[in-house]
Each structure stands twice: as structure tokens, then as C-alpha cells.
């Protein structure tokens, strides 16, 4: 069992590197804040983002130690389109899913260190390390 821990950590780091190269993801949406109008959450070493990014959201990327994802959603044509966008997917250690839909998009994924619920306000979902109350909303990156 002790031999598996380094392998898991190494695999998580690799996932984080690939996620950082994803569609608008990586550290731009990572850390404590969620992502703008439907962007991805972060996570400790994780990569977020979303295919749609910005307006309309899209799906968030996963991966990394303490991962967990922010969701989509956002504003389309100046309206609060609840239900559009959608959740992301987890990956690595402490995965989880982000919520989507509408202005401020649903809830962030739990799991990882300091997980819990993100989302709220204009931000996307939180999750992973430093998630929870810091995921999106007031602390979300615009």
C-alpha cells in the first residue's frame, strides 16, 4: 500500500499538467476562486476551465491532486439561462463534480482538501483544495 501512494501522486501531477493545457483551463481558473461566467473551478494542483469558457460555460476539465471541477452555465444573450452549460467531471485525488446552469451556475464539486460547495454569484464551481466558500461568487474570477 505504501508503494501505491507515490504512484498516485505522480499520476495526479501528470493529470494536472495535461489539464493545465486544456480548453481555457489550468491555473487561470484554479486556486480559491471559481471561473467567471461559467468557467471551471480549480483545486490544489488541478486544472479547470471549460470548453465554452466565459459566456455559456461548458464542461470543466478535471485532474490533479485535490481536483474537483467547476461547472458551466453563465449568461447567454443577456438572459439568465438556467440549466445550460452543465457539470464538469472529477479526476485525480479528491475528485468531484461541479454544478451548472444559469447565472452563477449551481454548486461546485466536493472532495479533496477543503472541499465542499462552490458556485454562487457570478462564479463557477469550486472544489478541491480551497474550495467550498471560496469557490466562485464573490471570490470568483471574472
Swiss-Prot record:
One of its GO terms (biological process) is defense response to bacterium. The keyword Signal applies. The modification Tyrosine amide is found at residue 139. Expressed in hemocytes (at protein level). Disulfide bonds: none annotated. Transmembrane segments: none annotated. One of its GO terms (cellular component) is extracellular region. It is found in: Secreted. The keyword Ion transport does not apply. Residues 1-19 form the signal peptide. Keywords: Amidation, Antibiotic, Antimicrobial, Immunity, Innate immunity, Secreted, Signal. Coiled coil: none annotated. Antimicrobial protein with bacteriostatic activity against the Gram-negative bacterium E.coli, and very weak activity against the Gram-positive bacterium S.aureus. Lacks activity against the yeast C.albicans. Belongs to the glycine-rich peptide family. This is Ctenidin-3. The lineage of its organism: Eukaryota, Metazoa, Ecdysozoa, Arthropoda, Chelicerata.
Amino acid at each position: 500500500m505504501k508503494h501505491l501512494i507515490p504512484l498516485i501522486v505522480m499520476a495526479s501531477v501528470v493529470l494536472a499538467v495535461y489539464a493545465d493545457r486544456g480548453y481555457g483551463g489550468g491555473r487561470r481558473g484554479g486556486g480559491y476562486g471559481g471561473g467567471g461566467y461559467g468557467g471551471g473551478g480549480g483545486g490544489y494542483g488541478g486544472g479547470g476551465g471549460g470548453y465554452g469558457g466565459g459566456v455559456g460555460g461548458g464542461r470543466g476539465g478535471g485532474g490533479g491532486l485535490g481536483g474537483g471541477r467547476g461547472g458551466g452555465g453563465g449568461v447567454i444573450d443577456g438572459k439568465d439561462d438556467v440549466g445550460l452549460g452543465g457539470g464538469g467531471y472529477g479526476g485525480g485525488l479528491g475528485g468531484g463534480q461541479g454544478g451548472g446552469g444559469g447565472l452563477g451556475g449551481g454548486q461546485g464539486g466536493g472532495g479533496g482538501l477543503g472541499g465542499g460547495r462552490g458556485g454562487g454569484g457570478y462564479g463557477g464551481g469550486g472544489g478541491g483544495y480551497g474550495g467550498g466558500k471560496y469557490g466562485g461568487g464573490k471570490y470568483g474570477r471574472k
